[in-house]
A protein has these predicted regions:
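Nucleotide-sugar-dependent
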Residues: 250, 306-324, 329-348, 358-369
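Nucleotide-activated donor-binding/catalytic signature segment of Leloir-type glycosyltransferases, i.e.
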Residues: 277-280, 284-320
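A conserved catalytic-core segment of Leloir-type glycosyltransferases
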Residues: 26-98
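Conserved donor-binding/catalytic core segment of Leloir-type glycosyltransferases
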Residues: 232-250, 256-259, 421
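N-terminal subdomain of nucleotide-sugar transferases
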Residues: 1-55, 186, 262, 267
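Acidic anion/phosphate-binding donor-loop and adjacent secondary structure
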Residues: 22, 51, 209, 214-236
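A charged, aromatic-enriched C-terminal amphipathic alpha-helix characteristic of glycosyltransferases
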Residues: 5, 381-389, 395-425
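A short, active-site helix/loop in glycosyltransferases that binds the activated sugar's phosphate group
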Residues: 171-212
Length: 425
């Protein structure tokens, strides 16, 4: 789906793959725009729940979300509801599983006709890996697998994910991970933690006859074409800015809680500190904290930035501008155990801005190390005293116009492609 992190992770690699002489044939859902640079086939999933999801997004992209959209999607939902219930009762998998079926059949045709030498599954949605597994078993084609998020969700630091889950979708993902280790030629993850726990569950990884596993840092293309950081201009406000989605497990409420403590010591800070949320609605915990603390003027929700008709700047250009104007960029990691295996994609975009990052992280030494080596403010989820101390340091640094100046060491997508091509040749 265009604009989503899972989509950008692969689409940003395409120019570098083309430059390396690779001729891709892309299979995807119908929820994005068809690429015209190469053969790009878009398939509707065959299962009822995924069909409903894909149809909604396709119709909205084609005709908007007006009255026709409401009528058509309502009719589709009514017609498919008994089949969706049956699908959940019989299988219990996440809705997108059935996309694997058309992808497998079309892939099989291309492989047998000699048009495909390598299958590269990436996700995101695990249906791509399922289709690739079927193709590997049917044809023996070379298979490369890129895993974005952990296939197996652990519950604690002691849990390595070998227990059989009660949830059927989780059981299938556990099975699929084993199959990938057994049958794929190369598998890579985006964090050291993800590779570590996958190896714990699958000791045969990186042994003869099984998948070669390694880590690729996905990086990001310079947002808005940024090539270098711009000198920062301090204003009368300390602007802390967060970009991206929010949820109760990834909430700005933890910063508002720290702000309450700061204001007891520095009451004048309330007039100077502004927290900006771009790109998503506020989570319920943040809304509750705003009401409780009277922070309506402190935390400002801007939502998604669209094209400005007055300046002509696109939404993306406005986002880049706001990132660069921020005194400090907020990186919320979350509080689930799987954060040990996950690095927010926004981190790589932040690196291009040259602005200091305040990372509030959880059980991820890999992410902590990358933040520290570049120069950042760092706190740990659950360490309330540490979060309060970090906010106070930011406040005092800003007052003295001495905020951390991070090292300019961004990661582009080109390095990820070089790593993949080197490991898999």
């Amino acid at each position: 789906m265009d604009g989503r992190a899972a989509s950008q992770t692969i689409t940003d690699k395409i120019p570098y793959l083309l430059k390396a002489g690779i001729k891709p044939t892309v299979f995807s859902a119908i929820t994005g725009i068809q690429d015209q640079r190469f053969l790009h086939r878009q398939f509707l999933a065959w299962g009822p729940s995924a069909f409903r999801f894909d149809f909604r997004h396709w119709f909205a992209n084609q005709y908007g979300r007006g009255i026709a959209y409401k009528i058509m999607t309502g009719l589709i939902s009514i017609l498919l509801s008994p089949f969706i219930a049956l699908e959940k009762l019989c299988l219990g998998y996440s809705s997108q599983w059935s996309w694997a079926m058309p992808a497998f059949l079309h892939g099989l045709q291309l492989i047998r006709s000699g048009h495909v030498d390598v299958v590269y599954s990436t996700g995101g949605a695990w249906s791509a890996h399922l289709a690739a597994l079927w193709l590997k078993k049917a044809t023996g084609v070379k298979w490369l697998a890129e895993i974005h998020d952990p296939m197996v969700i652990r519950s604690s630091p002691e849990d390595i994910g070998t227990a059989i889950p009660k949830n059927r979708d989780a059981r299938f993902r556990q099975y699929l991970e084993r199959q990938m280790i057994n049958h794929a030629d190369h598998v890579w993850w985006f964090t050291e933690g993800a590779l570590h726990y996958a190896k714990q569950r699958n000791p045969l990884l990186n042994t003869a006859g099984y998948a070669n596993g390694f880590v690729v840092l996905p990086g990001a293309e310079p947002p808005g074409g940024l090539a270098s950081p711009k000198p920062h201009v301090y204003s009368s406000k300390l602007n802390l800015s967060h970009f991206g989605s929010l949820a109760n497990d990834r909430s700005l409420s933890i910063i508002l809680k720290a702000l309450s403590a700061l204001l007891k010591k520095y009451p004048e800070a309330k007039e100077s500190i502004r927290i900006h949320a771009y790109g998503a609605a506020l989570d319920s915990l943040s809304i509750e904290a705003i009401k409780k603390g009277g922070y309506e003027d402190v935390l400002i929700a801007h939502g998604r930035l669209e094209k400005d008709p007055q300046t002509g700047k696109s939404g993306r250009e406005r986002v880049v501008q706001k990132m660069q104007e921020a005194d400090v960029l907020i990186l919320l990691h979350g509080n689930d155990e799987w954060c040990a295996e996950y690095i927010p994609s926004k981190f790589y975009e932040y690196l291009w801005t040259g602005r200091p990052i305040w990372g509030i992280t959880h059980h991820n030494p890999h992410l902590d190390g990358m933040l520290q080596e570049r120069g950042a403010y760092l706190s740990q989820v659950g360490d309330d005293a540490g979060i309060k101390a970090t906010l106070e340091k930011i406040w005092l640094d800003w007052k003295n116009q001495g905020l951390i100046e991070p090292k300019w060491h961004p990661m582009g997508v080109d390095q990820a492609v070089v790593r993949i091509l080197t490991e898999t040749k």
